[in-house]
């Protein structure tokens, strides 16, 4: 069968989707909001009927219901699978003590990263509502991770829980720092808040990378993904690689493995 797979990554802030062909190449991509208030529905009108939909959803039941409504409106009865983290899948072994507690987005991202950088030790930093770090050995063993507030959440927390600090978005903060990246210390409150929270992100990444390289006594590639990756990258002093399709690529691998298993049983 050559029908494509529809891949859906429902994150905490928005929903990304892609159509993957038989070679797992992402041939169509897009994004939309959790609700119609967050933007237009995806335009799937010109897409061929996929073999099925493979979904990572960390956004909850309301988003799951919205996805079902959208899928049924375009392709009634389309098979769909919402993935869960496993102990082992697509060459990656889950080091969590309770494997299914690992977020499905992080699991798919690990699978995508292992395939994208074969034979390399990796530290994967993803910048969304939360900043997550995953330590992935070259043999596919996920040995653990870290979760911290994302850049936007840090700034929003300070603005919300203090009387005199502003509440800044990442767009505002990025603009404020555009001409001040060379200066480690800022001379007004909005820029000080923006830079302080950004440096907190960069400091976390650099400390984690150094600790991991020391523990493993081997080179570790730092991989950055997510909406704030460009801003955090400018504050880093480490070499790094950008990859923005790890989750969708991982979903493509999961879908392909399942299709191969089904074909083998036929």
UniProtKB/Swiss-Prot annotation:
Task: Tell me the gene name.
Answer: coaX
Q: Which keywords annotate this record?
A: ATP-binding, Coenzyme A biosynthesis, Cytoplasm, Kinase, Nucleotide-binding, Potassium, Transferase
Active site at 105
Write out the annotated subcellular location.
Cytoplasm
EC? 2.7.1.33
NCBIfam families on file: baf, PRK13328.1-4
Q: Name one GO cellular component term.
A: cytoplasm
Classification via PANTHER family:
TYPE III PANTOTHENATE KINASE
Q: What does this protein do?
A: Catalyzes the phosphorylation of pantothenate (Pan), the first step in CoA biosynthesis.
Assembly and partners are described as: Homodimer.
Write the protein's name: Type III pantothenate kinase
Binding residues annotated for ATP, in chain numbering: 9-16, 129
Key word Oxidoreductase present? no
> Its Gene Ontology biological processes?
coenzyme A biosynthetic process
